[in-house]
Amino acid sequence: MALTSSSQAETWSLHPRASTASLPLGPQEQEAGGSPGASGGLPLEKVKRPMNAFMVWSSVQRRQMAQQNPKMHNSEISKRLGAQWKLLGDEEKRPFVEEAKRLRARHLRDYPDYKYRPRRKSKNSSTGSVPFSQEGGGLACGGSHWGPGYTTTQGSRGFGYQPPNYSTAYLPGSYTSSHCRPEAPLPCTFPQSDPRLQGELRPSFSPYLSPDSSTPYNTSLAGAPMPVTHL
């Protein structure tokens, strides 16, 4: 009898029973074993929020939909799962709601000091972008935007048609801040001693004025210089 008992002990030691850690766990056991409270000692910043009813339901549905549609994007899967969740009734949602309550109670028990703090996304300040006011400064009065090497051919090409007597002083090549505001045209005067100019101007106004008219225009035709306006 002693020999048989020793042989059974040796056989038992050679073939130990499978440990519980190697056995497949259900979803609840996996969640419990993988919870931060079971591992212990995690800071509160790394603790995740407890799942709600939709997350409990979609954790299985998402995996199935991803297997059926491997090329579907994750955002599209979430959109379809949200539409399906809205179509479910209260009776169908009840087991997932109860499971979410159980997870919330255990999360509160494991982390009594936990408080949800949403992380703010850091806004990257874009450097190198020139403000519009600085860029448009050269366009306002034609300052350094055109540059000194801007020729008259480029100016005529940019401004369209250029008349033959177009002054090159107003082209962008020499366009400075002093030309931002146009100056008033100077009145043109003719010499009083030239009888040809007076003779050409008088007949043009004679049909419109009577000989007996005492308007100030008659006095201007007598010999005073008359400004020429723009036609």
Curated annotation (Swiss-Prot):
Subunit text: Interacts with HAND1; the interaction enhances HAND1-induced differentiation of trophoblast giant cells. Interacts with POU5F1 (OCT3/4); binds synergistically with POU5F1 to DNA. Interacts with FHL3; the interaction recruits the transcriptional coactivator FHL3 to the FOXK1 promoter.
Organism name: Mus musculus (Mouse)
MF terms in GO: chromatin binding; DNA binding; DNA-binding transcription factor activity, RNA polymerase II-specific; RNA polymerase II cis-regulatory region sequence-specific DNA binding
Region called Disordered, residue ranges: 1-45, 111-136, 186-231
GO process terms (BP): cell differentiation; myoblast development; negative regulation of striated muscle tissue development; negative regulation of transcription by RNA polymerase II; positive regulation of G0 to G1 transition; positive regulation of myoblast proliferation; positive regulation of satellite cell activation involved in skeletal muscle regeneration; positive regulation of transcription by RNA polymerase II
DNA-binding residue intervals: 47-115
Keyword presence, Cell division: no
Record carries keyword Phosphoprotein: yes
Expression by tissue: Expressed in myoblasts (at protein level). Expressed in embryonic stem cells (at protein level). Expressed in myogenic progenitor cells (at protein level). Expressed in the ovary. Expressed in kidney, liver, skeletal muscle, and testes. Expressed in lung and skin. Expressed in the brain, heart, diaphragm, and intestines. Expressed in the conceptus tissues of the placenta.
GO cellular component: cytoplasm; nucleus; transcription regulator complex
Effect upon mutating E135G: In strain: various strains
Subcellular location(s) of the protein: Nucleus
Region (Required to promote HAND1 transcriptional activator activity): 1-45
Record-given protein name: Transcription factor SOX-15
Reported function: Transcription factor that binds to DNA at the 5'-AACAATG-3' consensus sequence. Acts as a transcriptional activator and repressor. Binds synergistically with POU5F1 (OCT3/4) to gene promoters. Binds to the FOXK1 promoter and recruits FHL3, resulting in transcriptional activation of FOXK1 which leads to myoblast proliferation. Acts as an inhibitor of myoblast differentiation via transcriptional repression which leads to down-regulation of the muscle-specific genes MYOD and MYOG. Involved in trophoblast giant cell differentiation via enhancement of HAND1 transcriptional activity.
Biased composition, class Polar residues, residue ranges: 1-11, 211-221
